[in-house]
């Protein structure tokens, strides 16, 4: 775990991030404080991609070491949530001990995105404000329009897949099939959308340790709405019932 945290922290610091704290095996970080960072959305997203690339290399290294590590280490994954917006930063704590940290709704949503990424079976979930600031420099999946736990307003979210020009093998077909299914879903064509999501599910990369994927999570939604149509006033959002 210390090796993993060292590798991830090195990437964070090399890409202009500020380390807030470690919470167990989690890394909390931000950009733009205490010193301003130009293009901070790009640096945050680049950090996330580089972390995933390095973790993939580490998995191979750990697996090559055989029985030194349990099999769960060979398939170690992480999740990252990214959001952009105002936050409060500064020294916070008691008169005996303080920590330079951050707080606010922006931070809360980023934490919710990290947690809910597991429901989609993805590594990196990014809010729209961050995505649109560097949209042309990365490959994205138009993931969802959701109300996360603890919020009342829906948020547009994306899966960050890779840097532009580095499309993973087969992902062009996956994204095309997925986008077609989402379009049918948003137009309330539930039966056709269900068939389309099942087709895109067949294309999804079910790598070791992955239990679901974005295509698969839409299928029960289509079944639900087929039996309980949301009506003409539906904004396309879905309320998550767990973090």
Question: Across the structure, where does each feature detected by a protein language model lie?
Answer:
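Helical mechanochemical/support elements of P-loop NTPase systems and associated helical scaffolds
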Residues: 4, 23, 40, 47, ...
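A short beta-strand->alpha-helix segment at the C-terminal rim
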Residues: 53-86, 109, 114-145
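Cytosolic regulatory/linker segments at or just downstream of nucleotide-handling modules
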Residues: 87-89, 116-192, 198-231
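Hydrophobic, well-ordered secondary-structure elements that form the walls
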Residues: 8, 44, 51, 82, ...
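Intrinsically disordered, low-complexity, charge-biased linker/tail regions
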Residues: 230-243
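Catalytic strand-loop-helix junctions within cyclic-nucleotide turnover domains
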Residues: 30-40, 80-100, 117-120, 161-164
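Cytosolic nucleotide-binding catalytic cores of signal-transduction proteins
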Residues: 7-8, 25-27, 48-55, 78, ...
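Catalytic NTP-binding/metal-coordinating core of nucleotidyl cyclase/transferase enzymes
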Residues: 1-47, 97-100
